[in-house]
Amino acid sequence: MCADSAGWVPILEADCLNTKLKDMNVDYLFKAVLSLETMEECYSFFEDLCTVPELKALSQRLEVAKMLSEGCVYSDIVSKTGASTATISRVNRSLNYGSDGYKVVFERVKG
């Protein structure tokens, strides 16, 4: 990991994160998320930041990733989450070829 010269939160090396994504605004967003201390603070922040459909889409992707990592098949994931097969495929690609972000979260978050 490395930090930029402006003192922003540590950022991942270029081989771990798409360089088109990495900038000061994204760093500030991540720093803001890392500053939240309670579930209530998270709800308040994300309610202000995102529309309901945006937040539902993010949470759906996380649920899809969890189900894929547990070995669920696409048809079961579609039935339970309502996600499209395109979304499931995209998440599956991230699980298999991504930066292991989902893996880190699943190891740290239980339930």
Regions found by a protein language model. Give the residues of each.
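General nucleic-acid-binding
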Residues: 1-36
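Residues at alpha-helix boundaries and the short loops/turns that link adjacent helices
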Residues: 36-40, 52, 71
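Short, Lys/Arg-enriched anionic-surface-contact patches
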Residues: 41-60, 110
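Short, amphipathic alpha-helical "recognition" segments used to contact nucleic acids or chromatin
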Residues: 58-72
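Major-groove recognition helix of helix-turn-helix-like DNA-binding domains
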Residues: 64, 88-95
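General marker for long, soluble alpha-helical cores
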Residues: 75, 103, 108-111
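Short alpha-helical "recognition helix" segments of helix-turn-helix
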Residues: 76-81, 88
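Short, solvent-exposed alpha-helical "recognition" segments
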Residues: 93-106
